[in-house]
Design a protein with these regions (language model features):
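Long, low-complexity or tandemly repetitive, helically biased scaffold regions used
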Residues: 13-73, 77-88
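Active-site-adjacent structural elements in enzyme catalytic cores
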Residues: 90-297
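A general, composition-driven signal for non-globular sequence regions
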Residues: 2, 52-53, 65, 74, ...
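Short terminal alpha-helical segments
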Residues: 1-13, 78
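Short, well-structured alpha-helical segments
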Residues: 6, 71, 173-174
């Protein structure tokens, strides 16, 4: 038991070093629970620790004779890691805030920004800024007749830029967004023509990567197709970004916590919902969370 807890604490320290604060805190909470249980077991046998019960206990848990010192050392190490985690979290929050401000400033001045999503890196522009969107098309070499999805911060944004939504839309959004799902709906009059390119529909994305979420919240609705030249592979890793794309983006934020699976695309504009692409979210998951999609094609 003691060796297991020691290994767990080492794992926590590794996660902190990797700046994976959420996972580190989760692992530390689990380990602290184990430490409490360990301490309770020690208290139960404390009176007879050096007798037969104590011998059996030490053998069962594979711990040395000086168990109280070991227990104290484990608790001290857990406390040290909690303080280290808090310090690192504050440092990374400051770094996140700086990067959000830098990306937001670029996007608010008609510039482009490379930001991570769950799937690949995206090349982002302010969706309501025609100059910026035209620049994005030019940099990517994207056909001008190819419409763009809107990256939004909230369900309210989806309602603002769409119309004739199905009654189960809020349930669908609540279950899967933020996340790797694109929802296609009828476009409202609030969607600029340079986004829908004459189409009556528009796709909505809500990325789950923290920095990209915060940038969208700060700037407003963004467009963000994959950060590659048209025809090239989509960049799953920062190293995959082409020099031409990097040169034309004022800001590029690295975060390789991307898992590389395609987004799932669902079209809700017809009488029957259509699954246009099954990606990270499967048909089975959609049906389990939203039974109203039972007739999906």
């Amino acid at each position: 038991m003691a060796s297991f807890l020691q290994a767990q604490l080492k794992d926590v320290e590794t996660l902190i070093a990797q700046e994976k604060e959420d996972k580190a805190q989760e692992a530390l909470n689990f380990t602290q629970g184990g430490l409490k249980n360990f301490a309770n077991e020690i208290e139960k046998v404390d009176g007879g620790f050096y007798g037969l019960v104590g011998i059996l206990f030490r053998r069962a848990y594979h711990v040395p004779d000086d168990i109280k010192k070991l227990r104290e050392a484990l608790f001290q190490e857990a406390e040290r890691l909690q303080k280290l985690l808090a310090k690192n979290s504050e440092k990374n929050r400051n770094k996140l805030d700086r990067n959000v401000a830098k990306a937001a400033k670029a996007l608010q001045t008609s510039e482009l920004a490379i930001l991570p999503t769950e799937t690949v890196y995206g090349l982002f522009a302010n969706a309501l800024d025609e100059k910026a969107v035209k620049k994005l098309y030019a940099v990517k070499g994207r056909p001008t007749e190819k419409a763009l999805n809107m990256n939004v911060a909230s369900y309210a944004d989806i309602l603002k830029y769409s119309k004739h939504q199905p009654v189960y839309l809020e349930k669908l959004v609540g279950a899967f967004l933020p996340g790797p799902l694109t929802i296609i709906l009828e476009a409202s009059n609030a969607v600029p023509e340079w986004i829908h390119i004459g189409k009556t529909t528009v796709g909505f994305r809500m990325p789950s990567i923290k920095i990209t979420q915060k940038v969208i919240e700060k700037v407003g609705v963004l467009v963000g197709p994959s950060a590659n030249l048209t025809g090239d592979p989509s960049p799953q890793f920062f190293a995959d970004l082409s020099p031409q794309i990097l040169e034309n983006a004022q800001v590029a934020i690295q975060d390789d916590s991307i898992y590389g699976l395609d987004t799932t695309i669902i079209d809700l504009t017809g009488k029957t919902p259509r699954l246009l692409r099954q990606g990270a979210i499967t048909r089975e998951q959609l049906l389990r969370e939203v039974p109203e999609l039972a007739d999906i094609q």
